Design a protein with these regions (language model features):
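Short, acidic Ser/Thr/Gly-rich low-complexity loop/linker segments typical of extracellular
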Residues: 43-57
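Conserved C-terminal beta-signal and adjacent last beta-strands/turns
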Residues: 256, 340, 384-393, 414-416, ...
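Short, acidic, small-residue-rich periplasmic hinge/interaction motif at the N-terminus
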Residues: 25, 30, 35-42, 68, ...
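Membrane-embedded beta-barrel scaffold of Gram-negative outer-membrane proteins
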Residues: 668-760
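Extracytoplasmic beta-strand/coil segments of soluble accessory domains associated
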Residues: 121, 138-180, 203
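Gram-negative outer-membrane beta-barrel transporters
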Residues: 595-597, 725-850
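Short acidic/polar hinge/loop motifs at secondary-structure boundaries
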Residues: 58-61, 180-208
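Short strand-turn segments of transmembrane beta-barrel domains in outer membranes
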Residues: 210-212, 223, 227-258, 269-271, ...
C-alpha cells in the first residue's frame, strides 16, 4: 500500500510545472544575447531548451527539480549548472579563444552536438548579423568559406556553393524556418527580396553541396537555411533605421510579446527604397559579328534591338562601303524601372497546447520592384508574394507536421529586352527598315564613297574588292561613321513621311511618344503584343517527420507532398486556351545514426525516394562517419547524393520571344535542323540545294539531374588559439539540364522553294556527357586578446572534366577566392564603460572567370577585390524604467568604390555606404 501511495505521490509531482528563470552574462557582467540553454537528461543534451534575449535573460518551464542545464554561446566556453529550485540564477560564461565570434562550424541536421557534425556548414548568429560590415546579413554571406554571392541588382542577390552559379539559382534551396522560399513560377528564391527581415533572424546556415536526403530534390548544390526568432524567447520592440548612398532608406521594426505561458506572437515590418545600379555595358557582346569600331554599329550588351544585322547581300560593288549594319537599339536604362522598393510584413502566432506540443501559424508577405536577370533582363515591378504556414511540433524535436502555401503575382513585371524589340517592330518592322537602309545608301552614299581617292577598282573580283574596301573604311572611319548616322536619319524621316507620324520620337528616349509607346508595350501581355507577363502561380506543400530514439541508434522517417499550380495565361507556360497545368511530386526519407567508442565515433545513413508525376522514382542515399580523434581534432567523411527535378519551365515553358520560341520538353522533340546546317544550305547555289542533307535530329524528353559527392573534412584547434576547418570534395554530375537550339523546317520540291518555312526553337534538354568537379576550402579563426579576432578563408573550385557537350551549363565560378577579416567586439571605452565599441573590416578577392548566361549575357568577369568595413557604438539607456540598448553604426559595402561586374550583363556594382541606428 505504501508503494502505491508513493507511486501516486511521485506521479502527482511530475505533473507540476517548474518555472526556471535566469540570465547569462560574460566575465564583465555584460548580457550575452542568443546563448543556448539546454536541459541535460541522463547526462546527455536533450532538445528541451531556449535561447537568451537581448538582455541575456531566459526562462524554461519544466516538470520538476533538480535539473541540469548546459549554457553555450559562440565565442565562450560552455558551462553546466545544476539548478535545484525556482530562484533566478545567473550563469557566467568565460571567453573561449578557440572559437571566432562570427563564423562557426555548426551541426549537420542529423547530429546532436556541434563537434560531431557530418558536414561543414557555414553559419552566422544574431550577433554576427548585427555586426556585419555589409549592408545586410544576406550580402555578408558572400564572405563565408565556400560561399559565392552574385549581385544582379540591389534587390536581387544570389547565393551559391560549389559551382554552376547562375542568376536563376534553381540548384540551391532557401529555407525560412523550414519553409521553401521559392517563387512558385520561377522555382527559385529571389535572394532575400521576399525573405525575412534582418531584425527577425537569429541564425543563418549555409550547407554546401548535395543535400537531397533530408531537404528534398531542390537541395542540389546547397541549402541556405534561415531561422527566425521565437516570440517566447525574444520579446519586446526592436527597430532600425538605415540611410545611405543611392538614396537608400531602410526601416524595420519587430514587435514580439509573450502574452502568457501558452501564447506568444510577433510582427515584423520592413521597408526599403533605393536607386538601383544601372546596367550600362556598351561593349560588344561575344556573339556580335562586329566590335565597337564598325561604322555600321554592333550588338551591345545592355542595348536591346541591335542584335540583328544586314549587309549588301553579296552586291558589294552596288553598295560600296555598306558593310554590316545594325539597327540602333534602346539602352536598358531607358527601359527598366531602377527605383527599387521592397516591403515585407511577417507575423507568427505561437500556442503551446502543453509542455510538449506547440502550434504555429505564420504569414510572410513581400512586395516590391527590382531587376532580375535570366535569359533576358526583367523589370520585376509590383510583384507580390504571400506564404501561409501551419505547423504542429513536439518541443523536443521528436516529430512535426507542417503545411504551407505560397502564392505570387507578377504584377506589372515585363521583359526589358523584348520590350525594345516590340517597340521597334510596332513602329518600323526590321525587314522594312533594312530594305530602306540599303536603298538610301545606294541613292545618297554610293556616289560619295566612289569619289574617295583610294576607292578600289570595280574590275577586281568581289572578294578582292571587299578586302580593299575594308582598308578604305579603316582609313576613313570618321567619314563612314557619319554616313551611317546620316543614313539612319534619312530612313527614319522617310518612314515619318510614309506613316504620317513621328517615327523618330517614338523610338527616342525622353520624348512623350517614347514613354507612351513603352507604357503601352509594358502594360500589354505577351499574348496581346506586349512584353508583360502574367504569373499567379502557387504551390502547396505538406510534410512530416518522426524521430525514434532506441538502443540501436536514432531513427528518423518523414515525407512530403507538393502540388504546383502554374497560372501564366499563356505568357510563360503552355496554359493557353483554358489548359490547366498541375504538377505533383512527393518523397519519403529515413535516416539512422549511432555513436560508438564513448561517442567519439558517429555513423549515419540516410536515404530519400522522390517521385514527380512526370518522371521515374529516384533514390538519393547518403552516409557519413565522424571521428573525434582527441579534444583538438575531428575527422569526417561523407558520401552524399542529390537529384533536381526539371523546373516548371523545363517541363511546360512556351515563351515566344519573336525570333525563337523557348519550349519545355516533357515528351521529346523530333526532326529538328541545326542553325549551322541552314546557314550552310543558304550558302549553296541553287543546283546544290536540291541535294542538300538537312541532317535531322531528335531530342529526348527531359529527365532529372543527378549528382554524387564524396567529401572529407578536418576540424582542429591548434596552439590552443587557432581554430581550423578544412574540407575537400569530389562531385560527379549526370543528366545536366540545359537547352538545344534548332529549327523546324518545311521542305519544298524545287531549288527555289526547298526551304519553304523555318521556325527556330530553344528546347530544354539533358546533357549526355558526365561532368566532374572538385574543390577545397579552409578557414582559420583566432582571437587576439579579449576583444579582437582575425579570420580568413580560401576556396578552390574546379571543373575537372573536359566537356564538349554544349548542353552542360556554365560553371560560372571563380577557381580561387579568399577572405581576410578583422573584428573588434564590445570594446569598453575608457571612462565610459557603459559604451561599447565595435568594428570590422573584411577584404574579399575573387579571381576572374567566364560567366555564361544567355548568348546576350556571356562574357568575362575580371578579377576584383572588395573591402567592407563598419564601426559601431553601443550604449545602454534607461527609458521609462526600461533598459534600452541603442547601436549606432557607420559602414560600407565595397568601401573603396571598386566598381565591378559580378555578373555579365548586370550593372557595375560600386560602393554603398550607410548610417544606421538600431534600438532594442
Amino acid at each position: 500500500m505504501n508503494k502505491i501511495l508513493l507511486a501516486f505521490f511521485l506521479s502527482f509531482c511530475i505533473q507540476l510545472n517548474a518555472q526556471i528563470n535566469g540570465s547569462v552574462v560574460d566575465d564583465k557582467n555584460e548580457p550575452i544575447i542568443g546563448a543556448s540553454v539546454r536541459v541535460l537528461i541522463n547526462g546527455e543534451l536533450s532538445k528541451v531548451g531556449t535561447v537568451t534575449d537581448f538582455d541575456g535573460k531566459w526562462s524554461l518551464e519544466l516538470y520538476n527539480f533538480p535539473v541540469q542545464v548546459e549554457v553555450s554561446s559562440m565565442g565562450y566556453s560552455s558551462k553546466r549548472k545544476l539548478i535545484e529550485n525556482s530562484r533566478s540564477v545567473i550563469i557566467r560564461l568565460n571567453p573561449d579563444r578557440n572559437v571566432l565570434k562570427e563564423v562557426s562550424i555548426v551541426q549537420q541536421r542529423l547530429s546532436e552536438q556541434q563537434e560531431k557534425s557530418a558536414l561543414t556548414v557555414e553559419s552566422m548568429d544574431a550577433l554576427a548579423i548585427k555586426e556585419s560590415p555589409s549592408v545586410s546579413f544576406y550580402d555578408h554571406l558572400g564572405t563565408l568559406k565556400g560561399v559565392d554571392l552574385t549581385s544582379a541588382s540591389i534587390g536581387f542577390k544570389i547565393i551559391n556553393t560549389r559551382g554552376f552559379n547562375s542568376t536563376s539559382p534553381v540548384r540551391s534551396l532557401q529555407l525560412i524556418d523550414g519553409v521553401d522560399n521559392q517563387s512558385p513560377g520561377l522555382n527559385f528564391s529571389l535572394g532575400n527580396f521576399l525573405g525575412a527581415p534582418d531584425l527577425d533572424i537569429v541564425s543563418v546556415d549555409v550547407i554546401a553541396g548535395a543535400s537531397t536526403a533530408f531537404y528534398g530534390p531542390s537541395a542540389f548544390n546547397g541549402v541556405i537555411s534561415m531561422t527566425t526568432k521565437d516570440p517566447f524567447d525574444f520579446t519586446g520592440i526592436s527597430s532600425s533605421l538605415k540611410v545611405g548612398e543611392r538614396n537608400l532608406t531602410e526601416f524595420s521594426v519587430r514587435w514580439a510579446d509573450k502574452v502568457n505561458e501558452k501564447f506568444a506572437y510577433k510582427i515584423n515590418l520592413f521597408a526599403l527604397k533605393a536607386d538601383d545600379w544601372e546596367a550600362g555595358n556598351m561593349t560588344a557582346t561575344d556573339i556580335s559579328a562586329d566590335n565597337e569600331l564598325n561604322p555600321g554599329g554592333y550588338d551591345a550588351v545592355n542595348r536591346y534591338g541591335d542584335e540583328e544585322y544586314w549587309d549588301a547581300g553579296g552586291d558589294v560593288k552596288g553598295y560600296p562601303g555598306l558593310g554590316r549594319f545594325y539597327r540602333p537599339g534602346i539602352e536598358e536604362r531607358h527601359l527598366v524601372d531602377y527605383d527599387t522598393e521592397n516591403i515585407k510584413l511577417t507575423t507568427a502566432l505561437h500556442y503551446k497546447f502543453n509542455d510538449k506540443v506547440r502550434g504555429i501559424y505564420a504569414m510572410n508577405f513581400g512586395a516590391g520592384t527590382t531587376v532580375y536577370q535570366g535569359d533576358n533582363r526583367y523589370s520585376l515591378k509590383d510583384i507580390l508574394f504571400l506564404q501561409n504556414r501551419l505547423e504542429l511540433r513536439e518541443e523536443t524535436g521528436k516529430w512535426f507536421l507542417r503545411a504551407y502555401s505560397t502564392h505570387e503575382d507578377a504584377g506589372n513585371s515585363y521583359d526589358a529586352y523584348f520590350t525594345a524589340l516590340r517597340m521597334q517592330d510596332s513602329i518600323v518592322p526590321n525587314q522594312f527598315y533594312s530594305n530602306q537602309y540599303r536603298t538610301m545608301w545606294y541613292i545618297f552614299n554610293r556616289p560619295q564613297v566612289r569619289a574617295l581617292p583610294d576607292y578600289p577598282s570595280n574590275t577586281l573580283s568581289n572578294s578582292d574588292f571587299e578586302a580593299e574596301m575594308q582598308q578604305v573604311i579603316a582609313n576613313n572611319r570618321d567619314f563612314f561613321n557619319q554616313l551611317h548616322d546620316t543614313t539612319n536619319t534619312i530612313v527614319m524621316n522617310f518612314m515619318e513621311a510614309v506613316y504620317g507620324y513621328s517615327v523618330v520620337n517614338y523610338l527616342k528616349p525622353g520624348t512623350a511618344e517614347f514613354d507612351q509607346l513603352k507604357g503601352h508595350i509594358t502594360s500589354s501581355l505577351f499574348t496581346e503584343g506586349g512584353s508583360r507577363f502574367y504569373d499567379k502561380s502557387a504551390l502547396y506543400h505538406t510534410q512530416g517527420e518522426r524521430r525514434f530514439d532506441t538502443d540501436a541508434g536514432q531513427f528518423r522517417v518523414g515525407g512530403n507532398v507538393r502540388i504546383y499550380t502554374p497560372n501564366s495565361a499563356g505568357t510563360i507556360f503552355s496554359d493557353t486556351s483554358g489548359v490547366v497545368i498541375r504538377n505533383y511530386e512527393g518523397g519519403i526519407y529515413g535516416g539512422w545514426e549511432q555513436f560508438y567508442k564513448d561517442e567519439r565515433l558517429k555513423a549515419s545513413v540516410t536515404a530519400r525516394l522522390d517521385k514527380n508525376q512526370n518522371f521515374q522514382p529516384l533514390l538519393s542515399p547518403a552516409a557519413s562517419v565522424v571521428y573525434k580523434a582527441n579534444e583538438n581534432n575531428t575527422l569526417r567523411f561523407s558520401v552524399s547524393s542529390a537529384i533536381r527535378n526539371p523546373t516548371l519551365a523545363d517541363q511546360y515553358l512556351y515563351y515566344n520571344v519573336g525570333r525563337a520560341v523557348l519550349l519545355g520538353n516533357l515528351n521529346g522533340f523530333d526532326s529538328l535542323v541545326t542553325i549551322d546546317n541552314i546557314v550552310e544550305y543558304l550558302g549553296k547555289p541553287g543546283a546544290d540545294r536540291l541535294t542538300h542533307d538537312f541532317g535531322y535530329f531528335d531530342i529526348d524528353a527531359i529527365r532529372p539531374e543527378r549528382v554524387r559527392t564524396a567529401e572529407v573534412g578536418w576540424r582542429a584547434t591548434l596552439f590552443d588559439r587557432v581554430f581550423v576547418d578544412a574540407n575537400y570534395y569530389y562531385s560527379n554530375y549526370n543528366d545536366f539540364i540545359g537547352y538545344v537550339i534548332g529549327a523546324k523546317i518545311v521542305e519544298g520540291t524545287t531549288a527555289i522553294d526547298r526551304l519553304k518555312e523555318v521556325q527556330v526553337y530553344r528546347v530544354a534538354a539533358n546533357a549526355t556527357e558526365q561532368v566532374t568537379t572538385q574543390g577545397f576550402s579552409i578557414g582559420l579563426n583566432t582571437f587576439l586578446g579579449d576583444y579582437q579576432s582575425l579570420s580568413g578563408n580560401y576556396s578552390w573550385n574546379k571543373l575537372t572534366s573536359d566537356v564538349n557537350d554544349p548542353i552542360v551549363p556554365a560553371f560560372n565560378t571563380p577557381e580561387h577566392k579568399f577572405n581576410v577579416g578583422w573584428n573588434l567586439r564590445n570594446y569598453p571605452i575608457k571612462k565610459k564603460k557603459e559604451m561599447l565599441l565595435g568594428a570590422g573590416v573584411n577584404y574579399k578577392w575573387i579571381e576572374g572567370f567566364l560567366f555564361e548566361g544567355s548568348p546576350q549575357f556571356t562574357g568575362s568577369i575580371s578579377s576584383y577585390g572588395l573591402v567592407d568595413a563598419q564601426c559601431s557604438l553601443t550604449k545602454d539607456y534607461l527609458i521609462n524604467d526600461t533598459k534600452t540598448t541603442i547601436t549606432y553604426k557607420i559602414g560600407s559595402s565595397n568601401a573603396l568604390n571598386n566598381q565591378v561586374y559580378q555578373v555579365f550583363g548586370g550593372p557595375l556594382v560600386g560602393r554603398l555606404a550607410y548610417l544606421s541606428i538600431q534600438i532594442n
